[in-house]
Amino acid sequence: MTPRALLAVVTLSLAACTVASKPDGNGSAMVAPDSMESVVKRTFTTYGFRLQSGQTLPEMTLAFETYGRLAPDGRNAILVTHGGTSSQHMAGKYSPTDPAPGGWDTLIGPGKAIDTNKYFVVSSNVLGSSYGSTAPASINPVTGKRYGPDFPEISMHDIVTAQRTLLRGLGVHRLVAVVGPSYGGYQAFQWSVSYPDDMAGIAAVITAPKGSGKEADVQALVDRFAKDPNWNGGWHYDRGGIPDTLTTLRIETLTRYGYNEILAEKFPTQADRDAEIRRRAEPWAKEFDPNSMVTMRRAAVRYGAEKDFSKIRARVLYVISRSDKLFPPSIAPDVMDKLAKAGVDAKYFQIDTEFGHSATGVEWAKWGPTLKAFVEGLSQ
């Protein structure tokens, strides 16, 4: 990388966290301690970021958060990668008055499966996403206007290379692990084949080593957006966006992800559950750029790590939810067989749950000890 490309602007204020509990040491009988507080939103910017396609982003920013502290030798870092429609806010709160902590707060923190008393955890917003990283809604510094639908095509390799650039900027040169659910699991697998010497292990959760769907599915998504009168060929920004279309899409997604089952105890009637799912869908629909959905979906359908399994040097923990409709347990035997044939040290764990694709946070107690033991075993 050129000296100019290494020029980066990083907000270096560390995320403060309360350290109120001691690690349990054996990965069993875990109790989720209180949430961390005062998590700080941070950004990293570099210049002249070259994509796999040969195109270059003149300026590339990643939004990120950190939990815990980096050891003096820089070798205690864990990268946590997020799902496709979620954000980098994986643990803690920005303010004590926030209604809820980050999505994996039950798993990340002092004494938890990913123990911030031991590890420096980095969670960055995916390149192309809608939560602060360079994406279609960003201003192109060359034109002074949003990229919009003209945003360059990116690959899963580009996504993890951007993360690697961030980590280098933070002083991290080798990871203990890359851990992530769903789209984050795609990234974990991609890390293991793109940069096999950069981590001791990966935990790929409710995911697969290859993308689902085809290019036609990307076009079908665009066609669906095009039915909204505000779409305007993707230039929807000055027309108020397409929140109604995105709300409907989000409701479908949350339902498919298992939210009916998750909400059943608190909301016993279907009408109440439907109302709660809509309540959760509407804010997301106002902030997520549909062009980001297209960009990330295209990267996903073109993604495939299986052909490069022979490159993997990291240990692998592969986790699937028994009731997941997106990545059902039926895919696991083939994945594990291919990993074994490639000589990969891999372990499989199935979460026994009715909560489908959304099980990992709410069912933390069922698989958190396995994750904790795996991560801590990487340091031995």
Each model region followed by its residue ranges:
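Conserved acidic catalytic loop of the alpha/beta-hydrolase fold
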Residues: 142-150, 157-177
